[in-house]
Amino acid sequence: MHVTRHIRQWTMPLLLAICMSATAQSIREEIELIPQRSAGIRYSLPTNEQLTDTPVPDGKKPFYISHYGSSAAYYLDNTKDYTGPLSTMAKADSLDKLTPLGQDVLHRLELIYKDAKLKVGELTEKGAQQMRQLAQQMVDRFPEVFVKGSIVDGRSIVRNHNILSMQEAMIQISRACAPMDLRIKSSHSNDAWMYVRDKDLEADRYNEETEASYQAFRMANKDDDRLMNLLFTDADYVKKHVDSIILSDQLFVVANTIQDTPLADQVTLYDLFTPDEIYRHWRIHNARTYISYGRFALNGTYQAYSQRAPLWNLLHMGDSVKNIGHPVVHLRYTTRGMLTSLICLMELNGYGLVTADLDQLDKQGWADYRIAPFGASVQVIHYRKDMDDDDILIKVLLNGKETRLPIESDCAPYYHWQDAKRYYLRKLYAYERLKYENETKKQKK
């Protein structure tokens, strides 16, 4: 990735206009141009885009990088994700119920499963390469931080692909830089601020009203009859023995997984779907991501608050490193779902969108492949002139790009650390107060 530094005016109104221009039509065009984007959070963040950095005000230099990222591309976690559609098609074939295209699709599914069956949940080779490239980009972009004597601390949740992603990144950094203090840890002791589950919020995630809204949206966007007619010779057999909604979705999910495997240039399933069908499938998955990790009005708008502990950690560590006399890098590798919630909680680029209308998501530019694809990250870069400089500035990068925060700044995309910290602390304390009040009311009943 080539990084250029340039001088430009960055204002809140301009950024808001850019954000609001992300209409449903532009998202649809993006997906039609690159169908792999329909994979949503399984789309791989490109590593060949040219990024730009606005010059830092007042000659300040980066001294601390606080990073929360997801793993790079990996195979599906569950063998049944591969065997489900395969068994449905194989059974139909044994009864002579497949069209020639259906038989060809069965053969493709067999090839895909053969490649994946012993690698379920593992990092793909392309994923490993992606993580090395992203690490190198960070080094190239902030050379002042990766110097002799710097501390680079890598932490991962206890998942195979997260551990390997962290490992690939740290190996690349060690190769590219002068001797540094490199530390790696993967432990459940990190779960309190890296793999956070809030059972109370999860219990409300798909309440009755939310489930009804999602199912209505899902049915409005489903159109599986054409595909079933292409694959099967007997409509009556399909009606009695095939769940067309499930099979269509299974084929779509598998289609999206191929892009990061050795079969990417050999096999596709996208040809089974029209551009409109691909877009509709993506809308359904995007809506589910939003309901689960965003700020959907019908389940209370608070699902993103499940990741308040990581935000507390970002704020705490930002103050803790100020008195350290050498650069520090904290790299944390968690899930894309949890990263999505953190991004929504921080309201980066307006992704803290609150709506009860799932049709509004793409119209408002809320697209999961833009938010937390494979290799996604939130990087908070801290800047100062020297250790006596109390006016620390931060810049937040979302997936490598300069990002708008929900606060005013006289030097955006840079923000005064004290302003950002104050805003987020108030937000977190307000939620804790609301939670306490609700618990008190329950106890009085």
Predicted regions, residues:
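Bacterial Sec-dependent N-terminal signal peptides
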Residues: M1-I27
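Signature for phosphate-centric chemistry
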Residues: Q25-D153, I157-H330, T334-K445
